Amino acid sequence: AAPLMVPEKETKDMNMLILGMGTGTYATQCKKYFGDMQMEGVEIDKKITDLSRKYFSLPDDVKVTTYDGRAYLQAMDEKYDVIMVDAYQDITIPFQMSSEEFFSMVKEHLTDDGVMVVNMNMRGSGEGNINQYLSDTISSVFGNVYTVDVDGSTNRELFASDDADMMNVLQ
């Protein structure tokens, strides 16, 4: 959904950064539906990238840099239409990639109408759950935050942008 949220752009003119490439599932799906979009990923473990290409069909035209995602953002100036945060340490998002400072850095690397997507690998309900804390942190940085449960999965996707029109795509 994230590529559809960036208004008035052809997908060939869009670019996406994935922090925490893992097996490349998100990149593979985006290539399937938005094939001409420019896409790159950052994965801290080269062995994971090698496995993703060998066993999970990560497309060859998706550039993957072996680096820490937060350090990568700090080292570059590029702006993106979509930044996907999908980094995990065991089953949780690493602390250094779940703070206000980190999400502010992500925002600095988005275009004015850009969208950040965070893959939350578990659904939580009720007050005080980890997803609520993460949503509150992101809401302190972005003007618009929306979460969507992924059908047939335990995943929940969080979309964040300062562009209020992005909400219309999700409704």
Report the location of each language-model feature.
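The AdoMet/dcAdoMet-binding core of the Class I SAM-like
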Residues: 1-117, 121, 125-135, 139-141, ...
